Amino acid sequence: VHWTSEEKQYITSLWAKVNVGEVGGEALARLLIVYPWTQRFFASFGNLSSANAILHNAKVLAHGQKVLTSFGEAVKNLDNIKKTFAQLSELHCEKLHVDPENFKLLGNILIIVLATHFPKEFTPASQAAWTKLVNAVAHALALGYH
């Protein structure tokens, strides 16, 4: 992926303001609420019976933080996203059997959550850079699938 200096600036400046626990937990919770079939990957997380239960599920929130912390590695390694996510791609493909389309869904939800948390900073140009990033991460995570 080729990044312009402006795109890198949009991504890194917004990322510096992100509360990984809050945004990550909210993004994963929204994924599970809006796309309930994704809940099958999180059966061990306990009560996912309602939106309220999901939004307050400690395991969902903790895993959301873990996911977004990992996503932060993409921000730090914009020029080598494929290598950054090679092991996670293999894990999600070989062991967890996650449908790679779910990575795109989560990326789209992350864009929405960022826009709601940072309405002033999330300009059309910023959104374009972030969309490019979440698509690059989703693609890198899908590479382990044959």
UniProtKB/Swiss-Prot annotation:
InterPro entries: Globin (IPR000971), Globin-like_sf (IPR009050), Globin/Proto (IPR012292), Hemoglobin_b (IPR002337), Hemoglobin_oxygen_transport (IPR050056)
Molecular functions (GO terms): haptoglobin binding; heme binding; metal ion binding; organic acid binding; oxygen binding; oxygen carrier activity; peroxidase activity
Gene Ontology CC terms, in alphabetical order: blood microparticle; haptoglobin-hemoglobin complex; hemoglobin complex
One Pfam family, short name: Globin
Residue stretches making up the Globin domain: 2-146
GO BP terms, alphabetized: hydrogen peroxide catabolic process
Residues annotated as binding heme b: 63, 92
PROSITE patterns: GLOBIN
Tissues expressing the protein: Red blood cells.
UniProt keywords, alphabetically: Heme, Iron, Metal-binding, Oxygen transport, Transport
Quaternary assembly: Hemoglobins A and D are heterotetramers of alpha-1, alpha-2 and two identical beta chains.
UniProt similarity note: Belongs to the globin family.
Function: Involved in oxygen transport from the lung to the various peripheral tissues.
Further information: Hemoglobin A is the major, and hemoglobin D the minor hemoglobin of this species.
Name of the featured protein: Hemoglobin A/D subunit beta
